[in-house]
């Protein structure tokens, strides 16, 4: 009998309001399971970014409960938040690169903060910049990079430390279709080879169709539309994404 997988994230009747305004998120109940690939969709203003803010611990809900990695996020002391955030990789819409650091040093930041040996940092960052076609821009400061280049640096930084949960807000919005597909394949490699749970917010229907075994979470006016059992219970069959598959190369080697 297959052991029921643990839960990465569990929302229980979560609501969120800003100030005295009406709720921007209402009655959200769902579970994210290890090693799954999720797309978050919905019209502009549906609440996608607000939901992502809850996921990457930038916001606490107005009501309801959230558990992450087995801990209650509502009662978690703020002093413990940094340790939890180290388990996350986040791609923001506005990139949030460190202005005075080069592209290389921005990507290296999570590894250095984790205390990785500099030789390993150099190898990992060089490989990652090569994957996102930015080796030639390694020494460039963010202000000299195009929007698409900044986005690729932000994505490389988010995945470099092999997070347990990757959260990406419109990660392909500033790149051409060829690079968008390549970045999606990078997320899939992280998902397949490392076992990272991936949540991608996007309007791009074609992008969603390229990950056939993904699960779709659709928001409408702050509520989860058409919720399925897959968002509440683990899949009946293993998705083929093993959290123990860390021996495989990441990022994957380039094909000739």
Functional labels for PLM-detected ranges:
Residues 141-145, 149:
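Conserved ABC ATPase signature
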Residues 56:
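Helix-to-loop junction immediately C-terminal to a conserved catalytic motif
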